[in-house]
């Protein structure tokens, strides 16, 4: 097994343990046991539990940021951009439900990357809010409080990591379509 593959295996196993127990409760010994190796062997591939958490959270946050940039730069209507945001959340969450649990529940444990993470999150939310505000201005979206619209949508989208693993019979495309209908129909004019 290559160094990078083993590192990814460690990160994925840690994400699963963090989801099950929470970041603070997981030890390097727990991680080693889950992988069937000695704790000292982990340090051949990673430097600390904190580095694992950073790898999980920052990778996902950067993926969301890149997705949002693509959405912002598209020529789609504001309603279509909101649908693309729903699809972005579903695709990222479907591909990494364990990592999404860390993003939602353990971000505050980031140490030297906390400010960077918060910058990414704030930029994402600012862009999301901007789409909603432009949709209200262009009469695509009902004139409600844009922050309430955004946080209502984000609350649903951020909790998908809990629900998606239970619905293996539902494709990401079907879920994106259905969830867009539910979340956006109420604000669409």
Model region roles, listed by residue range:
Residues 1-5:
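N-terminal intrinsically disordered/low-complexity leader segments
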Residues 6-9, 17-51, 55:
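Helix-turn-helix
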Residues 11, 57, 61, 82, ...:
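Amphipathic, non-transmembrane alpha-helical scaffold segments
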Residues 13-17, 92, 156:
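Short amphipathic alpha-helical elements of helix-turn-helix/winged-helix folds
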Residues 46, 104-110:
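Short helix-capping/turn signature of helix-turn-helix
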Residues 55, 59, 69-95, 149-153:
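Hydrophobic alpha-helical connector segments
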Residues 62-65, 69, 95, 113-138, ...:
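Amphipathic alpha-helical packing segments from all-alpha helical-bundle domains
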Residues 100-105, 114, 118, 136-182:
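Hydrophobic/aromatic-rich alpha-helical bundle segments in the mid-to-C-terminal region
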